[in-house]
Amino acid sequence: MESIRAGVSRERLTHLQQLEAESIHIIREVAAEFENPVMMYSIGKDSSVMLHLARKAFYPGKIPFPLLHVDTDWKFKEMITFRDETAKKYGLDLIVHKNPDGLAMGINPFVHGSGKHTDIMKTEGLKQALNQHGFDAAFGGARRDEEKSRAKERVYSFRDKSHRWDPKNQRPELWRVYNSQVNKGESIRVFPLSNWTELDIWQYIYLENIDIVPLYFAAVRPVVERNGIKIMVDDERMPIGPEDEVKQELVRFRTLGCYPLTGAIESDATTLPEIIEEMLLTTSSERQGRLIDHDQAGSMEQKKRQGYF
């Protein structure tokens, strides 16, 4: 659990050390200021970094708040295995919530589409969990470089009693001073990784030796190409039509979510240094393979206004 210090004087921090210090400061601030915070755990690389930072923030003590995973029932099998192993390894207080109404209706991305699936299983599921446990602050692993609606979001993102985000009703954050005042029923979404980039995340994972889901590394996997996007066949629920051709291809994932809505990329990067080298050369967004971002123009901002993370 040591900080990155190799080759750096005590008087000057590297940019990763500065980002680490800022994130730890934010995490400690939230733990001190709010009555009932929670950390969202989506099992992806950003969540893994955020969890690592939370463990550092309170080491050698335990993390003083629970983790919450909103499970849509359509995550990659390797993600669920990794989630359970991580919770057991670190003795985490992990809450897993599935929207019971969505499960009863049989909501799934193949039949109902990405928009309805995301709204019911993720957005409504998240709001259910936050209301059920009375959380007044929720950490998220979003970064400003990911997507334009996230680029204009504050570190402390104010949400009303219906968990809605109004970009015009946010608070100034001058000199890293954060306003944590909320009325009963209101909440704050907190983003400690706001100032990190995708490359920062990968370099930090490498330097700190952070465990991540194996799906981020290239391997031969069964994929079906639909609308130019390679979808991995993760279980028997994937409908395979006569026109579909399942191919074994060397692919990996830059971002993870529900497997029917997450596209793989062709890659031979099987190690962290190879992924970092690939990131230095790429000219495309990491979210190019997320189908929920392509529902319609401004779809991510609309989802956030409705309560999505």
From Swiss-Prot:
Record's keyword annotation contains ATP-binding: yes
Reactions that this protein is recorded to catalyse: sulfate + ATP + H(+) = adenosine 5'-phosphosulfate + diphosphate
Signal peptide segment: none
Gene Ontology BP terms: hydrogen sulfide biosynthetic process; sulfate assimilation
Pfam families associated with the record: PAPS_reduct
Record Gene3D superfamilies: HUPs
Alphabetical UniProt keywords: ATP-binding, Nucleotide-binding, Nucleotidyltransferase, Transferase
Pathway: Sulfur metabolism; hydrogen sulfide biosynthesis; sulfite from sulfate: step 1/3
InterPro entries given in the database record: PAPS_reduct_dom, Rossmann-like_a/b/a_fold, SO4_adenylTrfase_ssu, Sulfate_adenylyltrnsfr_sub2
CDD domains in the record: Sulfate_adenylyltransferase_2
EC code: 2.7.7.4
GO molecular function: ATP binding; sulfate adenylyltransferase (ATP) activity
NCBIfam families referenced in this protein's UniProt entry, alphabetically: CysD, PRK05253.1, PRK12563.1
PANTHER family to which the protein is assigned, alphabetical: SULFATE ADENYLYLTRANSFERASE SUBUNIT 2
The protein's assembly and partners: Heterodimer composed of CysD, the smaller subunit, and CysN.
Record's function text: With CysN forms the ATP sulfurylase (ATPS) that catalyzes the adenylation of sulfate producing adenosine 5'-phosphosulfate (APS) and diphosphate, the first enzymatic step in sulfur assimilation pathway. APS synthesis involves the formation of a high-energy phosphoric-sulfuric acid anhydride bond driven by GTP hydrolysis by CysN coupled to ATP hydrolysis by CysD.
Family: Belongs to the PAPS reductase family. CysD subfamily.
Name of the protein: Sulfate adenylyltransferase subunit 2
